[in-house]
A protein has these predicted regions:
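Sequence/structural signature of beta-propeller domains
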Residues: 3, 10-387
Length: 387
């Protein structure tokens, strides 16, 4: 995108509304992300198109799936309440996976397969009979980790291509999971928890990735200087034993994050959102320090609010989906400055979910979780591309 990140130092706010701090050089990795051809954005949003989406000049939208209706060229009825998603390369095409934030037995994950020209060639389920699958995370070994957002929620490792059965991963803990990001260099996973007093978790596997069968689950402890340390959870699966203490209460010093949402790994940084205070955070893995990149309270009016799913654009901007707010997908540059990428109109009781770019960076997928009928939860999944 033309709004690519620069090397200007950006300002962020301390953990508890402290003084403004200059971010060190290690955080400037945000400004060195690779550029992709084709998906560049410039200019204000135009009037809504036929699908009710306001886009910048030069872009178009199409509907690829609607809840309760069969996806083109398949027998799969698209699930209700589409939520977190990701794209995976497949031959000269790709697969877009999407969680279903429905309750048992309707939760799970669906997938749409596209050919190299973006035509839909199939759709199918890759996980079913689960509960409240909210977001998740793609792995470098091409699986999708789907997170249950319930008190005893688990993480399931799924195959986007529909060839292998899903596997439950208890070692990642039982709690109100939201999303997960994989640090492929350090060999660790980072997980968010959607509770008003939730934690940021880190999982270190006992064996090298991609083995997730066993390991150590820890919570972040942040000091007054925004330095991060980690303390182990004594029992990551409290709902399976006589121990009733939930994971977020097992370490007294654990730092509370107010409603953890989307999370993303990018070149040594962990980027995540917290919805109850409308913040975007950046954790520097090497330095083990954490900063606030965006705080809605510092913007009047707040262009970005209701922060939720997070991804990174081909040009390196952080892309944040709004749960409510103005029903926008919003870009953040290295200064934390927000710019709307698109806006969905006529669906004020919904939320935007699952933003993901195709492997070539030419197309963007996302959903309006409840569409125009919030009661029936008839979600709509869209594709954005150039004219």
């Amino acid at each position: 995108m033309d709004k690519s990140l620069t090397r200007r130092t950006f300002l962020s706010y301390a953990l508890q509304q402290g003084p403004v701090l200059a971010v060190g050089a290690s955080f400037m990795q945000l400004s060195t992300l690779s550029h992709a051809k084709g998906f560049t954005v410039a200019g204000p949003l135009k009037a809504a198109d036929a699908n009710g989406i306001r886009l910048p000049k030069g872009f178009k939208s199409r509907i690829v799936a609607i809840s309760g209706k069969k996806v083109s060229n398949s027998q799969y009825e698209w699930h209700q309440s589409p939520d977190g998603g990701a794209c995976f390369a497949q031959g000269d095409g790709w697969v877009y996976v999407s969680n279903s934030e429905e309750y048992f037995p309707d939760g799970g994950v669906g997938a749409i397969a596209f050919d190299g020209q973006g035509n839909i060639k199939d759709a199918y389920s890759i996980l079913d009979n689960t509960v409240g699958n909210c977001a998740g995370g793609a792995t470098p070994w091409h699986t999708w980790l789907s997170c249950e957002e319930v008190n005893c929620g688990a993480v399931y490792e799924t195959d986007p291509f529909g060839k292998k059965a899903a596997i439950k991963r208890p070692a990642l803990g039982y709690f109100k999971h939201e999303a997960v990001a994989v640090d492929s260099v350090g060999g660790q996973l980072y997980l968010t928890e959607d509770e008003k007093d939730g934690c940021l978790y880190r999982f270190t596997p006992s064996k090298p990735l991609p083995d997730l069968t066993a390991g150590v689950l820890e919570v972040a402890v942040v000091d007054a200087h925004q330095r991060v340390s980690w303390q182990a959870i004594t029992e990551p699966n409290p709902w399976n034993t006589a121990l009733s203490t939930r994971t977020r209460y097992q370490v007294k010093q654990a730092t509370q994050f107010r409603g953890g949402e989307g999370i993303w790994y990018q070149k040594g940084l962990i980027i995540f959102s917290t919805k109850r205070d409308d913040r975007i955070w950046v954790l520097d893995i090497a330095a083990q320090t954490i900063k606030v990149l965006y705080d809605a309270k510092q913007h009047h009016p707040a262009i970005l609010s209701g922060v939720d799913n997070v991804t990174v654009s081909p040009s390196g901007d952080i892309l944040v989906a709004e749960d409510g707010g103005n029903m926008q997908l919003v870009l953040l540059d290295a200064n934390g400055s927000p710019t709307p990428l698109l806006q969905v109109t006529g669906q004020a009781d919904s939320e935007l979910t699952g933003p993901a770019f195709s492997p070539d960076g030419q197309r963007l997928y996302f959903s309006s979780q409840r569409g125009q009928d919030a009661e029936q939860r008839l979600g709509i999944t869209y594709e954005i591309s150039r004219l």
